[in-house]
Amino acid sequence: VDITDLLEKNESYFGLGRFEMDLGIGTYVPESSFLKEVCPAAKSLTIRFVRTCMSVSPFPDPSVKSEPTRWEYGVSLCLLDKIPMEGRMIDGRVGYFTNKVRNYDNAVYDKGECEFISRWKLVPHREQLEAYLGGDLVEPIKPIVFYIDKQIPTWLYPYVKRAVEAWQPAFERAGFKNAILARPEPTYAEDSVFSVDNARYAYISYKTSPLKNAYGPSSVDPRSGEILCSHIGIFNSISDL
């Protein structure tokens, strides 16, 4: 299947169209835009683009000339497991992040919609299942691992790592030890397929910016609510709040 036209257009799946207002950009300039590289990995594909768009002022002024702006970014495509994790429906009595999807099997969902709790998939090793069910702490097959931006100041790294792993006691109450870990961003020699753009990796990025903010969205499997990855952004001025 030839998808060249789909990749070259500045549409919602691979383009910047839905971010125009946030980025302050307007008209797409295709002749100055290109697909930079395609990076395949196990069950995933990362595509990097360079797009050129004209700038747009939030307060239009005819005397101000629109200038071209160039943006480089990545898009990650991942192959989901054939059999999804068993989803857990929302319970309005407890606050959770959720993901609502329309389900067309009305024999199961009368309202045509289902809303799953967003949660990580933690599963004990088969040989430890009996111990897990007996109340012993066991390590999950696939722990939650957050990689920390190599650009983060050296003095700040141990505090970010400690903040991530401070959640371990909560997972221990669910029967898992060492369920959530923080590690430094690997070098190419350590992991040749690692990419910040790859949705298979949870990542904490460091932003050198006067903006006093932080964010932490996650990508989930719509079939079950399984959290596939999370990308946390920390701005260096957040300490000024």
Predicted regions mapped to residue ranges:
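Auxiliary tRNA-acceptor-end handling modules of aminoacyl-tRNA synthetases
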Residues: V1-I152, A170-A174, E185-L241
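Zn2+-dependent metallopeptidase catalytic core
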Residues: Q151-A179
